Amino acid sequence: MERILVPIDGSKCARHAMEKAKAIAKAFGSTVVLLHVNDFYQHVTLYKMTEVEEMFMEQFDQLSKDILAEGKAFFAELGDRVETVQLEGNVANRIIEYVNSNSFDLVVIGSRGKTGSMDFLVGGVAHKVALHAETSVMLVR
């Protein structure tokens, strides 16, 4: 188990996923890649952004960086075996694209994120990733 992807969004379930991934990484000497997808970009017009949209975009970008920094701090004991990636767009689609275009042995993802989704048992993003990722996926509550 060389590489583990952990999509994070700052939610409680994402924290639980990080805890599981950390235990696995420590046991196998794995590299952990923390991924945060900023979905604000899919809600703004590409033609011309207003000042308010630009301000929100900057705030969401900083929030993404903060989430990744907190995640990296959580995995500090792994040293250089922790990487962070920030992407923009539809959360589920970008996670799936990233997983399927890179070499991962496992995806560890929280069963529900911050979207407030009321999907039965499993959130929409986690469900879509589990169905479409071309590697093993562990859903964590």
Residue ranges and their predicted role:
Residues 30-31, 80, 104, 135:
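Short glycine/serine/threonine/alanine-rich loop segments
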Residues 137-141:
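Short hydrophobic/aromatic patches at helix-to-coil boundaries
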Residues 50-53, 101-103, 125-126:
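Short, hinge-like loop/turn segments at secondary-structure boundaries
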Residues 2-51, 76, 83:
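Small/aliphatic-rich secondary-structure junction motif
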Residues 73-107:
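Structural beta-alpha unit
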Residues 106-131:
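Glycine-rich, Arg-bearing micro-motifs that act as flexible, cationic patches
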Residues 52-66:
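A short acidic, glycine-rich active-site loop
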